[in-house]
């Protein structure tokens, strides 16, 4: 095996990266995540997410749990409601992990990637 790949496989971040990617590798979870990213810091109650995505609340609950466990979204109780929001720090960390070894750490080789994460 090549040394670079060996380093990546031994990286303690590999498991966390895979957890984040696996959480997004399903249609309802990806749509939920994108909806929460669009809602900015305000977040959304589970019922509103369910309505927006036309997904049964009990089905959505399992997906919200997976996204929460991955760290990509956060949940906060506000009265009787659970408010879900994107964890932008975790998103930035995931994106950085994906590109940190890109182009042999030569930024000039990754011009397009320099635009990642800029809104």
Across the structure, where does each feature detected by a protein language model lie?
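Divalent metal-coordination and catalytic microenvironments
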Residues: 60, 67, 84
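Beta-hairpin "wing" of winged helix-turn-helix
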Residues: 69-78, 85
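Functional cleft and adjacent loop/helix regions within the main domain
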Residues: 60-63, 76
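Amphipathic alpha-helical dimerization/coiled-coil segments
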Residues: 1-16, 34-38, 88-119
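N-terminal helix-turn-helix DNA-binding core of bacterial DNA-binding proteins
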Residues: 15-56, 82-91
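Alpha-helical residues within the helix-turn-helix
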Residues: 51, 62, 68-69
């Amino acid at each position: 095996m090549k040394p670079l790949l060996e380093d990546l496989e031994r990286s303690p971040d590999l498991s966390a990266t895979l957890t984040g990617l696996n959480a997004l590798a399903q249609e309802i979870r990806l749509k939920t995540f994108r909806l929460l990213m669009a809602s900015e810091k305000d977040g959304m109650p589970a019922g509103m997410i369910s309505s927006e995505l036309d997904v049964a609340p009990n089905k959505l609950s399992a997906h919200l749990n997976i996204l929460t466990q991955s760290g990509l979204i956060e949940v906060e109780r506000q009265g009787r409601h659970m408010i879900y929001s994107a964890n932008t720090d975790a998103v930035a960390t995931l994106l950085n992990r994906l590109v940190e070894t890109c182009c042999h750490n030569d930024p000039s080789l990754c011009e397009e990637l320099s635009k990642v994460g800029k809104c």
